[in-house]
Structure formats: structure tokens, C-alpha cells
């Protein structure tokens, strides 16, 4: 019974760490590259500004 409680507390702790780390960007340059959509190519940015879809 005590082992199950420990396992449950450990599981909750790991899940909270994953949620917290998932909200922050790994580095700010990646965040700048990804601007409004998830495309990493440079030539894609002007194309996306001219077409009606993201």
C-alpha cells in the first residue's frame, strides 16, 4: 500500500515536470524561426504572407 502511494506521488511529480518543461521554448531562436506557423524554411515566410492560407 505504501509503495503504491509512493509510485502515485512519483508519477504525479514526473507529469508536472513534463507539463512545466513543455510550456517553455527550448531556445529563443527556435521560437523566432517558428513565428506564426511551424515551417522552418526561410523562403517559406514570404510565400505565407502572400497566400490566404497559413
UniProtKB/Swiss-Prot annotation:
Location within or outside the cell: Secreted; Secreted, Extracellular space
GO molecular function, one term: hormone activity
InterPro entries xrefs: ELA (IPR047853)
GO process annotations (BP): adult heart development; angiogenesis; apelin receptor signaling pathway; cell migration involved in mesendoderm migration; coronary vasculature development; embryonic heart tube development; endoderm development; G protein-coupled receptor signaling pathway
Spans through the membrane: none
Subunit structure: Interacts with APLNR.
Role description: Peptide hormone that functions as endogenous ligand for the G-protein-coupled apelin receptor (APLNR/APJ), that plays a role in the regulation of normal cardiovascular function and fluid homeostasis. Functions as a balanced agonist activating both G(i) protein pathway and beta-arrestin pathway of APLNR. Downstream G proteins activation, apelin can inhibit cAMP production and activate key intracellular effectors such as ERKs. On the other hand, APLNR activation induces beta-arrestin recruitment to the membrane leading to desensitization and internalization of the receptor.
Protein name: Apelin receptor early endogenous ligand
Species name: Homo sapiens
Classification of source organism: Eukaryota, Metazoa, Chordata, Craniata, Vertebrata
Amino acid at each position: 500500500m505504501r509503495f503504491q502511494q509512493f509510485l502515485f506521488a512519483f508519477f504525479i511529480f514526473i507529469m508536472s515536470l513534463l507539463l512545466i518543461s513543455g510550456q517553455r521554448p527550448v531556445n529563443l531562436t527556435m521560437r523566432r524561426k517558428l513565428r506564426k506557423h511551424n515551417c522552418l524554411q526561410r523562403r517559406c515566410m514570404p510565400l505565407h504572407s502572400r497566400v490566404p492560407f497559413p
